[in-house]
């Protein structure tokens, strides 16, 4: 069922909280892989199916009619994020005139339904649990941080300084190669403004940033 309101979406997300991947997959008649080595997107696909997401692999939000993006957040036993969170691919060409306000990153992060999931590898995939959903919109300070990082990183792209980009740049968001392997290439802008072959780059939220979102949610629950 495709949720028609935010309330319906949240209700559906709350209804699967506490289930294991195996329980939910059996309900939906979806086979469970032994691990995620060859099926990295399996958990996201499972939750998209359970919640009625509509975007598939398109660039729009997962629940575009509600303006909501779905993000899984693997956490460890202490409740800390285990990995960075992919947001979107960076526009390496045809990016003149792109501003933060009309960027894919801002669009994707304007409203997110976070689904924390058990991610510790010693727990068999079937037995990992789904956590309580978190509806999140960036605070003014978070938006400022995201905008600052995006502008700094996009400046390097537009000015042809791809070779200067490292994962260390960015307070809350970083740029990293995004591709199944190092042979994946795309077009980018070189030092002299020429078009070059380069690795696709993706914007990723740092673990410290998503931990902040989790902690803020837990604080409201403990009040």
Swiss-Prot record:
Example of a GO cellular component annotation carried by this entry: cytoplasm
Query: What name is this protein filed under?
Result: DNA mismatch repair protein MutH
| Keyword field contains Disulfide bond | no
Q: Which InterPro entries match?
A: DNA_mismatch_repair_MutH (IPR004230), DNA_rep_MutH/RE_typeII_Sau3AI (IPR011337), DNA_rep_MutH/T2_RE_sf (IPR037057), Restrct_endonuc-II-like (IPR011335)
One Pfam family from the record: MutH
State the family named in the UniProt similarity comment for this chain. Answer: Belongs to the MutH family.
Q: Which UniProt keywords apply?
A: Cytoplasm, DNA damage, DNA repair, Endonuclease, Hydrolase, Nuclease
Briefly, what is this protein's role?
Sequence-specific endonuclease that cleaves unmethylated GATC sequences. It is involved in DNA mismatch repair.
Q: What is its main location?
A: cytoplasm
The answer to whether keyword Transcription applies is: no
SMART domains reported in the protein's UniProt record = MutH
Per the UniProt entry, what species is this protein from, by scientific name? Haemophilus influenzae (strain ATCC 51907 / DSM 11121 / KW20 / Rd)
């Amino acid at each position: 069922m495709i949720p028609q309101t935010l309330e319906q979406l949240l209700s559906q997300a709350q209804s699967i909280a506490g289930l294991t991947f195996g329980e939910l997959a059996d309900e939906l008649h979806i086979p469970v892989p032994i691990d995620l080595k060859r099926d990295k997107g399996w958990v996201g696909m499972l939750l998209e199916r359970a919640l009625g997401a509509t975007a598939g692999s398109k660039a729009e939000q997962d629940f575009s009619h509600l303006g909501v993006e779905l993000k899984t957040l693997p956490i460890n036993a202490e409740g800390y994020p285990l990995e960075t969170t992919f947001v979107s691919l960076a526009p390496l060409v045809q990016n003149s005139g792109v501003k933060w306000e009309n960027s894919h990153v801002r669009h994707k992060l304007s409203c997110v339904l976070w689904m924390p999931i058990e991610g510790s590898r010693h727990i068999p995939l079937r037995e990992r649990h789904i956590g309580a959903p978190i509806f999140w919109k960036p605070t003014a300070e978070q938006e400022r941080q995201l905008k600052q990082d995006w502008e700094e990183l996009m400046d390097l792209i537009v000015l042809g300084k791809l070779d200067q980009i490292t994962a260390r740049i960015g307070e809350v968001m970083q740029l990293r190669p995004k591709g199944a392997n190092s042979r994946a290439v795309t077009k980018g802008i070189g030092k002299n403004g020429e078009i070059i072959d380069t690795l696709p780059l993706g914007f990723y939220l740092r673990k410290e940033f998503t931990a902040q979102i989790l902690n803020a949610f837990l604080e409201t629950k403990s009040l």
